[in-house]
Amino acid sequence: MDEDGAVMIPVEGGRRFKEMSVGKHMLNYDSIVVLTHFKGHAMGGFGGSLKNIAIGCADGAIGKKMVHAAPDNEDYESWLKGEPFMENMVESAKATIDHFGKRIVYINVLRNMSVDCDCAGVRAAPVKAHDLGILASTDILAVEQASIDMVYTSPEAELHDLKERIESRKGLRQLSYMNELKMGNDQYELITI
């Protein structure tokens, strides 16, 4: 989306950012489908639809740097594993979500989940949970909360490493901060189809 540059779009109600830099071509679309392989993530604790929007729609030259930038006086490794990074990701995603409004559908595929992100390639930890299902919603918080709830109610032996990764990186802050920013509803109903 950023082949021809970037544009700044507002982060409504943002505490960390007032605007986010996204790929210029995003303005050419009136809707978006977010198809996500839900899994662990080295920095985010877990990678769901929010992480994909936050990092995927932020442009490479400016937006991604905004999300990953720690204050000058912070130890970067500690900062990256804390709540401020999660809040940066949430606000980055909020800009895109606000831009599209109700014209977004989120699909989280909870299959072949590992503690590591797909970007780790062949170095990724082995798959522990093979198939928990596919969740879809037009509410970002509902689909992420339901995904996390399915992980946390799975047998401990299958997803212990993933739960540990989520907690060690403060990944659940993604959910609580989305709730604080009124980005969706953490109450949901699962409907089997």
Labelled PLM ranges:
Residues 1-193:
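Extended, low-polarity segments enriched in aliphatic/aromatic residues
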